[in-house]
Amino acid sequence: MSLATLGLTAGVWTKAAWAQGPAASFSPHDLAQASELMRQALASDTAWRLLHELAVGIGPRPAGSPGDQRAVAWAQKALRELGLQQVRTQAILLKVWQRGHGAARLLGGAAPGASGLTPAEAPRDLVMAALGNSISTPADGVQAEVAWYPSLAALMDEPADPARSRANGRIVFIDQKTERARDGSGYGRAVGARLNGPVEAARRGAVAFGLRSVGTSGGTPEAGAATDAGRDAQRVAHTGATRYDLRVQPIPAFAVSVPDADVIAARVAQGHVLQLWVKMDNRSDVPALTHNVIGEVPGTDLAHEVVLIGAHLDSWDLGQGAVDDGAGVAIVSAAAGLMAQAAARAPAHARPRRTVRVVLFANEENG
């Protein structure tokens, strides 16, 4: 996120905190103060510095993990140094999911040819990642024929009845691509396959569920994947939460990298009958302790009314959590810091009337 975003949000939040009432207009002084905060935000590197400290200095921070504990300590220190008051934590006891070892292999499958069957393709080890909350496979893994679908909608078009679905007894693979969009809207359209695909596949008798990673890396020149080396560099599987229905027997769920999904799609297009083997060893319901981190810019005569701004402090385990949601943490913290510093310099009558409360939330990813 840009510092322009930080400046705009700082201005909006400041005006809300200083506002006289729901229908009140803003005085020239209020508008000038908001504009000055926006100017300071655009000239400041505080958000970038905070993001670097969190994403690079701490890195992955799943709820309850050592990285999460370091992030909680860092956040308290950062908010205090930014000038926020009443910095505190809120303890949360929870049970978390933990990733274990995972592996997947696409096994060679014969295809119809001019003279019977063409030779089988060579087996291919896939870059994969278990979806968050996925159950484990049996100790020796799961192997079955692949039932390929271009989208979740295509799977949903089949009856939720194993006897009437080709998913029955197979590993369902959803090959839904994420469309590139400046506003990230392609992610929203594709993520439903990750959230709902495993339970819908299970309703139809599937023994496991896989999907193309929700993301746009790999497979296109824009992503730096025009060469084999570029494609290999993009062989990264994207994780994220999935969910089960207690009324449906859960099945293992995983994602493969975009280039690996391209290989699966190409072999399907050539008419190959594919077999896939997958093995995962995950843990669920592991007791853990984490914390929300809270800080405030106190109000004056309307201090009991609160303007709440927040982001989530935790991240998944396979990356640094820079965008999700390190950028959010950095932006709201830096914006609140600007307001705290402005309030400290201002006379009492010019301070925000309402309390501005920052909450850096715990366990969003798996909560």
What residues fall within each predicted segment?
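Boundary at the C-terminal end of the N-terminal hydrophobic targeting segment
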Residues: 14-19
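Short helix-loop-beta-strand segments that form the rim/entrance of peptidase-like active sites
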Residues: 49, 337-367
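N-terminal capping segment at the start of a domain
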Residues: 25-65, 222, 250-253, 314-315
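N-terminal export leaders
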Residues: 1-3
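Soluble metallo-hydrolase cores and metallopeptidase-like ectodomains found primarily
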Residues: 31-33, 107-110, 128-160, 164, ...
